[in-house]
Regions:
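Canonical P-loop GTPase G-domain recognition
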Residues: 116-173
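Conserved G1/Walker A P-loop phosphate-binding module
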Residues: 1-53, 57, 163-164, 168, ...
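Conserved NTP-handling cores and scaffolds of large molecular machines
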Residues: 3-4, 41, 70-73, 83, ...
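Amphipathic alpha-helical transducer elements in NTP-driven molecular machines
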Residues: 16, 59-63, 90, 94, ...
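Residue-level signal for inorganic ion chemistry
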Residues: 22, 112, 154
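Conserved nucleotide-binding/hydrolysis micro-motifs of P-loop NTPases
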Residues: 15, 48-50, 86-89, 113-118, ...
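Short, solvent-exposed loop/turn segments at secondary-structure boundaries
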Residues: 54-58, 119-122
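Conserved C-terminal guanine-recognition region of P-loop GTPase G domains, centered on the G4
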Residues: 63-139
Length: 185
C-alpha cells in the first residue's frame, strides 16, 4: 500500500495515542482484483508509551485504551512486544508483557533499532532486554525496519500463529457442532 495505508511514525517514541488496525490480505485470485482478495488476518498496533513525554493523564488514558482493547480480544493469536534494543526494559514493558502472559497467548519480543548498535554493543544489549523481561533463550528477536533484519522471521511467526489459531477455532467449532448434534439426537 501507499502512504495513506500506513500509520504515521513520528520522531518521538510512543507519541501515537491511537490504535491502528490493519487487515492483512491474502493472495488474490489469478486475474482478480485486489478488492476480491480476502482478509487473512488482522493486526492491531497499540500505542507505545514507554519513553514518550506524555502527561500523566494522557499516559493513563493510553494505557486504559490498550487494556480495554486487549481485554476484548479473546481470539488473539499472538502478542508481539517491540522494545528498543538500546534501552533497558521499563516497568511499562514488563506490565505489557505480564498482561499478554495473563491472556495466555504466545508471545514474541522484538528488539528494534538493532541497526543503531555496533557488533560489540548488540550482544550485551540483547542480554539486557532478555534479563529485564525474563525472556527465554532465542528471544528477543532482532528487528530492524531500516535493514529489514528479522522482519521475514517475524512475519513467519505471525503467519504460523494465525494458522494455528484458525485450526484451534475450527476444532472448537467442530466440537461444539458434534456436541449439539449429540444433544439433538
Amino acid at each position: 500500500g501507499g502512504p495513506a495505508d500506513r500509520a504515521r511514525v513520528g520522531k518521538t517514541p510512543g507519541a501515537t495515542a491511537a490504535v491502528n488496525l490493519y487487515a492483512v490480505v491474502g493472495q488474490r485470485k489469478r486475474g482478480g482484483s485486489a478488492a476480491e482478495a480476502k482478509p487473512l488476518l488482522g493486526l492491531a498496533d497499540l500505542p507505545g508509551f514507554g519513553y514518550a513525554k506524555l502527561s500523566k493523564d494522557t499516559k493513563a488514558a493510553v494505557e486504559e485504551a490498550a487494556e480495554r482493547y486487549l481485554g476484548r480480544r479473546r481470539e488473539l493469536a499472538l502478542g508481539i512486544l517491540l522494545v528498543d534494543a538500546r534501552r533497558t526494559p521499563s516497568a511499562d514493558d514488563r506490565a505489557v508483557l505480564a498482561a499478554l502472559y495473563d491472556m495466555d497467548v504466545p508471545i514474541v519480543v522484538g528488539a528494534t533499532k538493532v541497526d543503531k548498535l555496533s557488533v560489540n554493543e548488540l550482544g550485551p544489549a540483547l542480554e539486557t532486554v532478555r534479563e529485564g523481561l525474563g525472556l527465554p533463550d532465542g528471544q528477543p528477536l532482532c528487528v530492524s525496519s531500516v535493514t529489514g533484519e528479522g522482519t521475514k522471521d517475524l512475519w513467519r511467526i505471525i503467519l504460523d500463529a494465525a494458522e494455528t489459531r484458525v485450526e484451534e477455532l475450527a476444532e472448537k467449532a467442530q466440537g461444539l457442532t458434534a456436541s449439539k448434534t449429540a444433544e439433538d439426537g
